[in-house]
Amino acid sequence: MAFELPNLPYGFDALEPHIDKQTMEIHHDKHHNTYVTKLNAAVEGTDLESKSIEEIVANLDSVPENIQTAVRNNGGGHLNHSLFWELLTPNSEEKGTVVDKIKEQWGSLDAFKEEFADKAAARFGSGWAWLVVNNGNLEIVTTPNQDNPLTEGKTPILGLDVWEHAYYLKYQNKRPDYISAFWNVVNWEKVDELYNAAK
């Protein structure tokens, strides 16, 4: 069965003014759609067609060598963006078990946000910043390109796309401003759901 571009759970303009409508349209309809198209082309005729994208990305070493790079890049792009859309909401509310755990581990939500923002800003070139569950504990990691923490056995519960295509139309070269705006649209309810499933 072919992989499909998921619908956004909100309108393209729902995250304004933090993430603009034009960026959302291009990011979802063009960038994410291209990852899906190229992923389907790469796995066509293989047994990967019947597997979930999570299973594929978690087991990249078992992907045939001749398509491994295409699957890593485009499969990662599809998985990362599918998760990213769900982690955003126009109705952000900082609450839940995961928020309590963050405060316990970092001392405060602000201290966590500062470390996450620093690592996201320091990610050289294109990539992602993540909050992951690793052996029951929370950890902030970054990955290059479209790599996903699942490949390293870590479960992502919050992710931020720091590719320039995610913010350049509105924020140009001011990645830290985009990262700061991100906190206004985090879907903590979804983060909490993922945390409780992973811990």
Swiss-Prot record:
Metal-binding listed as a keyword: yes
Record keyword Manganese present: yes
Cofactor(s) the protein needs: Mn(2+); Fe(3+)
Database matches in SUPFAM superfamilies: Fe,Mn superoxide dismutase (SOD), C-terminal domain, Fe,Mn superoxide dismutase (SOD), N-terminal domain
Cofactor, free-text remark: Binds 1 Mn(2+) or Fe(3+) ion per subunit.
Name of the protein in question: Superoxide dismutase [Mn/Fe]
Pfam families found in the cross-reference section: Sod_Fe_C, Sod_Fe_N
Family the UniProt entry places it in: Belongs to the iron/manganese superoxide dismutase family.
Complex and partners: Homodimer.
Domain of life: Bacteria
MF term (GO), any: metal ion binding
Reactions mediated catalytically: 2 superoxide + 2 H(+) = H2O2 + O2
Residues annotated for Mn(2+) binding in this entry: H27, H81, D161, H165
InterPro entries xrefs: Mn/Fe_SOD (IPR001189), Mn/Fe_SOD_BS (IPR019833), Mn/Fe_SOD_C (IPR019832), Mn/Fe_SOD_N (IPR019831), Mn/Fe_SOD_N_sf (IPR036324), SOD_C_sf (IPR036314)
Cellular component annotations (GO), alphabetically ordered: cytoplasm
Gene designation: sodA
Listed PROSITE patterns: SOD_MN
